[in-house]
């Protein structure tokens, strides 16, 4: 259940064809047939973007390429200047659209899957105690009473059981890009949200939580759905005001996607801190997205003895480690569950980001650097080229 991964490996590399605008997968197992993500050039205006979509619709209709159910341009997104849209085309139509000088690139859509001081004694999960201590073996979580107050947490995942007592009425439903069922039928999203901001199990116990459902009950979704969820969260944050107190967690991923990485970069540029799971394949995290997005804070999983978890991804794109093995947190239906994975590690960091925003006023853009600055060099035998930094909330600094 940890880091939710693409069902089959794909897009291990991206080849560029047709004037560098149409990206193709070297391994097509996870590619959704006739589904694309179209990304526009940075200098395309909103008006030009609208005109392009009308033109693309006409091209699709004129060429009579609807015989296989392709419907042409679909939902569009504008994430802090990143403009694009999802589309259902056949490959020839996609090539025609890619020839428009306004188009930066087109890539196939793919499947992704579901990644005053207060002392809380006898914590229900060892991870909480570990992040407020510079040594292993502690059993209390020590934190400032601000506890993420005034910060909004966006859980981009399978949804959140907003009625769970661990959220104390602080969790709200945001959007659902998957289905018409505004519940967490999987449990992964509730668990990660609880780790970040639950009253009992979480780091930032006073933060507001918003459910952004991009994965279904089976834990699967699409890159385009993830981008749509990010787009919604950016717009929601802007509607709440530009105070910079927003964090997002994406404990999910798939193979490398330029579109997902570009969306992640623009989430951060918009003023939202972004924590992402490194992945659970025991391989270099640079092969997956959004873990490989440079602007995101990419998190590997540690064990209770400060080891690098056997399953965790690694490499230079990892910013730091956080507790990710045998983590207990809330689960739909009022109970709890113990899970392992980088999916469990990432929300610890999202929670600390919210905590530091409330306590120190750190900005979203500087939060990852501040977290790394506070982290201890505690991980033993980290894989070559991977940081040994372990999450620490800085309570005794």
Curated annotation (Swiss-Prot):
Residue positions with a glycan: 113, 249, 284
EC identifiers of the protein: 3.4.21.-
Keyword Cell wall biogenesis/degradation attributed: no
Important for catalytic activity, annotated site positions: 280
GO cellular component, one term: extracellular space
Active site (catalytic residues): 157, 188, 343
Gene Ontology annotations of biological process type: proteolysis
Major site of localization recorded for this protein: secreted
Protein keywords: Allergen, Glycoprotein, Hydrolase, Protease, Secreted, Serine protease, Signal, Zymogen
Enzyme class: hydrolase
Domain Peptidase S8: 125-397
Domain Inhibitor I9 span(s) in chain numbering: 35-113
Subcellular location: Secreted
Propeptide regions on this chain: 20-115
Domain of life from the UniProt record: Eukaryota
Gene Ontology molecular function terms on file: serine-type endopeptidase activity
Function: Serine protease.
Protein name: Subtilisin-like serine protease Pen ch 13.0101
Organism name: Penicillium rubens
């Amino acid at each position: 259940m940890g880091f939710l991964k693409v069902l089959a490996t794909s897009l291990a590399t991206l080849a560029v064809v047709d004037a560098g605008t149409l990206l193709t997968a070297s391994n097509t197992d996870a590619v959704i047939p006739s589904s694309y993500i179209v990304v526009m050039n940075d200098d395309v205006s909103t008006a030009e973007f609208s005109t392009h979509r009308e033109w693309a619709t006409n091209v699709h209709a004129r060429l009579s390429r609807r015989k296989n159910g392709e419907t042409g341009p679909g939902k569009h997104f504008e994430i802090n200047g990143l403009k694009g849209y999802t589309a259902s085309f056949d490959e020839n139509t996609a090539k025609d659209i890619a020839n428009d000088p306004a188009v930066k690139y087109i890539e196939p859509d793919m499947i992704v899957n579901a990644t005053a001081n207060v002392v809380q004694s006898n914590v229900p999960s060892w991870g909480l105690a570990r992040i407020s201590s510079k040594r292993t073996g502690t059993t209390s979580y020590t934190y400032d009473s601000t506890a993420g107050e005034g910060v909004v947490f966006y859980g981009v995942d399978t949804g959140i059981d907003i009625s769970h007592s661990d959220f104390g009425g602080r969790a709200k439903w945001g959007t659902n890009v998957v289905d018409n069922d505004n519940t967490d039928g999987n449990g992964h999203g509730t668990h990660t949200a609880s780790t970040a901001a639950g009253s009992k199990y979480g780091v930032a116990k006073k933060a507001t939580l918003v459910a952004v459902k991009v994965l279904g009950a089976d834990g699967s979704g699409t890159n385009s759905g993830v981008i749509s969820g990010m787009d919604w969260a950016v717009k929601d944050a802007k509607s709440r005001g530009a105070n910079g107190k927003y964090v997002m967690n994406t404990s999910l991923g798939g193979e490398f996607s330029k579109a997902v990485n570009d969306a992640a970069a623009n989430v951060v540029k918009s003023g939202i801190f972004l924590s992402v799971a490194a992945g659970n394949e025991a391989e270099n995290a640079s092969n997956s997205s959004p873990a490989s997005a440079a602007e995101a804070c990419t998190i590997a999983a540690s064990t209770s003895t400060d080891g690098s978890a056997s399953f965790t991804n690694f490499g230079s794109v990892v910013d730091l480690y956080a507790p990710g093995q045998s983590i207990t947190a809330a689960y739909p239906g009022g109970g709890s569950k113990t899970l392992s994975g980088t999916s469990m590690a990432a929300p610890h960091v999202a929670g600390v980001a919210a905590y530091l925003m409330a306590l120190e006023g750190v900005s979203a853009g500087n939060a990852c650097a501040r977290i790394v600055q506070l982290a201890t060099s505690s991980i033993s035998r980290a894989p070559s080229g991977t940081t040994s930094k372990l999450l620490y909330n800085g309570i005794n600094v």
